[in-house]
């Protein structure tokens, strides 16, 4: 049952509590827990690493296998290039190195450009990974960026940096005019020949082509930013749509849960009624058995009574038959007695009439009341 606290794999207790926590805000919802875990995975920092907890138990979050992943085994397997700590390759374009700029001024300009996050595309990424690649295994000299030398023929040809023509009468390396100026006392100026001065840069077709490519790259970067902004807007709209769908599904799930609760309540109500009916049915079965026993007893008693009635009827019939026989016997005897009495009366009357010579009523009439009263 889903109402118990059994969280085994064959039970739905955990699913029920998971749903109720998500709907009614008890403890913490799964969506919020997933959001926290996802945010921790995205903003993971090795310095502030803390063990994740889920229901009081520690767990290891799943890492992503990509070049920007927190799992360094991917970089070790495929030997990917590390992110650049400093973008020295962009400095000649944004801030050309000039010999007359001081080192402090150039460093301040580079720091200002480095702190400008609005124009630095990779600033956030560099800041995010800054400090994570500080171990000895990340200091591979073969992967570090090396600025090209000033006497690189490709750079010299690209920016048309001409090599100065030194006088042939000076042996050895031609001395630098800046070093000589540093060695002179204050207020002393060195006059250099126009032929010995450092030639100025010339904006050639290659340089203009490089600027055009930079402009095209800027346009492409702008288009990329617009596309990224559009994707972000689409992502926001998609999240809004997902949120609306989530609320709709959440409301539907709440309705389904309420209906399920109502269904379970009705089920348990019917189950209680079923139990009562089973108890009543047990009592009814006992009563039916009692009725059957009583009916059997009634049938047996009826049979016994019928047998007794039959026997009594037979006895009555026999008695009636005997009575009829007795009555018929008495009737025959009465008739025989009456005939004998009549005969005797006639004899007596004849004798009396002869002896007295007087006509008297018949003897029958004189003795009839006496005989009648005697018979009664």
Swiss-Prot record:
One GO cellular component term noted in the UniProt record for this chain: cytoplasm
Subcellular location as annotated: Cytoplasm, Cytoskeleton, Microtubule organizing center, Spindle pole body
Coiled coil (residue ranges): 204-350
Residues spanning the signal sequence: none
Entry-linked Pfam families: BBP1_C (PF15272), BBP1_N (PF15271)
Predominant location category: cytoplasm
Residue ranges of the TM segments: none
Stretches the record annotates as Disordered: 34-67, 103-134
Keywords noted in UniProt: Coiled coil, Cytoplasm, Cytoskeleton
Biased composition (Low complexity): 103-114
Family: Belongs to the BBP1 family.
Oligomeric and partner information: Homodimer.
Function: Component of the spindle pole body (SPB) required for insertion of the nascent SPB into the nuclear envelope and for the proper execution of spindle pole body (SPB) duplication. Connects the central plaque of the SPB with the half-bridge. Required for proper localization of CDC5 at the SPB and for proper M-phase progression.
Protein name: Spindle pole component BBP1
